[in-house]
Amino acid sequence: MYFHGTTKVNEKGHLEIGGVDTIELAQKYGTPLYVYDVALIRERARGFKNTFDELGIKAQVAYASKAFSTVAMIQLAEEEGLSLDVVSGGELYTALVAGFPVHKIHFHGNNKSRAELEMALEHQIGCIVVDNFHELDLIDSICSEKNVKTNILLRVTPGIEAHTHDYILTGQEDSKFGFDLQNGQAEKALQIALNSNFVEVLGVHCHIGSQIFDTTGFVLAARKIFEKLKEWKDRLSYEPKVLNLGGGFGIRYTEEDDPIPASQYVKEIINEVKKQVSAYSMKMPEIWIEPGRSLVGDAGTTLYQIGSRKDVPNVRHYVAVDGGMSDNIRPALYNAKYEAVLANKPLAKADETVSIAGKCCESGDMLIWDLPLPKADSDDILAVFCTGAYGYSMANNYNRIPRPAVVFVENGESMLVVKRKHMRTSSAMICL
C-alpha cells in the first residue's frame, strides 16, 4: 500500500497521520471524518513556489479553493505565501472571513451575479477573471455606477483537449467557459475591455482541464495563446502583464495514476513561455498558476466506521460504511477510484475482496469496487486515501445525512477546523 505524506503505521499497529493515531481521531471526533495532513499541504505548496523562485520567475501560485474551501485552509494558504482563486460569492466570503489579503484574490466563474461582482469590487480584490461578454458589460456598468476601477484577466479557450474525464475538460472549444481564441471572440472581448475607462486588462487566463499527468497540453496551450498575443501586439499594441495557465496538475489516487513532480510542470511551462517570448520579441509576463487538487488531494483521508455486510455467494461481498455519496460523490459522478485500508489493522494480510457501499438509499452509492482487505468486521475503521479535494467541497445532505467534521493534523496534534453538522442544524433553515 502506498502511503502519502506523514501517513504511516505506528507502534500500536494503527494508521497514523501527522503523528496522530487515526483510531483515536475516530473515537474523539466521530465518523465519517475528513483528516488533513497539514505538513503534506505545506510540502505541495512549496514545491510550486520554490521552483518559480529557483528559476527567478515572477509568479503567483494561487490556491484553487474550490478543491477545499474552509477558513482554516485559506489561512494555511496565506501562511504559505499563496494567492487565492475563488469561484463564487460563498468562496469569496470565506476568504474575507479568513482575513486573506484581498489584493491576492482572483475571482473566477462563468456566471457571476451582480451581487457577487459588487462584493468583489467593494472589497477591491486583486483580479476578476472575465468569462463572457455579459460579464464584461456588467463589470463595466457596475464600475461606472460606483466610479471604481478593477483589474481583469480574459479567460480564453485555446482549443486544447487535455487527457482527462469529459466533465473536467475546460480548455477545448466546445466549453461553457471563456472566450474562444480561434473564432475571434477573445480579440473582440479584448477590444471592448481596452476601450473601457474602468478595467485594466492584466492579461489572459486559460484552464485546459484537471487531473493531467503530462505537460503537453500546457505547452500547446501556451503556444496557441502566444500566436494570438503576437497578433494582438501587432494589431492592438497590446502585450499582457500576466499569463495565467490555470491548474489541473494530476495526483496519485491509485497505482494506475502516474503524476509528475510540481517542479517538472513549472519548469516545462516556463521553458515554453520563454521560447514564445523570444520568438515573438515580447516582454516576459508574470506567470500565474492555480493548483487545487495537487495541493490538498493526497493530503486528505476520510475515516469511516464499518457497519453491515452482505455476501452474495459467488458474486460479491458488500461492506457498508457510515458515509458515502453524501461526503464523497466523486465515485458516482466521475467513476473516481480510491485506495483504502482498515486503519485499525493496516498491515493485516488481505484475504478477501470486498466492495465498499455507502449508506445512501441509492444503488449507485458505491465508494470502492473490488477492494482487497483483511476480514472487515463491524466497528472497524476504514481509511480512504486521497479524499482531500472535492470531498468536503462537494459534500451534500442527500437523505438528510449531516456533513462530516474536518480535522487538521500536524506534529502530533489535531485541530477541529469544521464542526460536524447535526440533524438539528441541517433542518434549521427549513420553513414550516
UniProtKB/Swiss-Prot annotation:
Keywords: Amino-acid biosynthesis, Decarboxylase, Lyase, Lysine biosynthesis, Pyridoxal phosphate. This is Diaminopimelate decarboxylase. Its cofactor is pyridoxal 5'-phosphate. Substrate binds at R293, R330, Y334, E362, Y390. Its EC number is 4.1.1.20. Pyridoxal 5'-phosphate binds at G248, E290, P291, G292, R293, Y390. It catalyses: meso-2,6-diaminopimelate + H(+) = L-lysine + CO2. It comes from Bacillus methanolicus. The active site is at C361. The modification N6-(pyridoxal phosphate)lysine is found at K66. It is an enzyme of class 4 (lyase). PROSITE patterns: ODR_DC_2_1, ODR_DC_2_2. Pathway: Amino-acid biosynthesis; L-lysine biosynthesis via DAP pathway; L-lysine from DL-2,6-diaminopimelate: step 1/1. NCBIfam families: lysA. Homodimer. Belongs to the Orn/Lys/Arg decarboxylase class-II family. LysA subfamily.
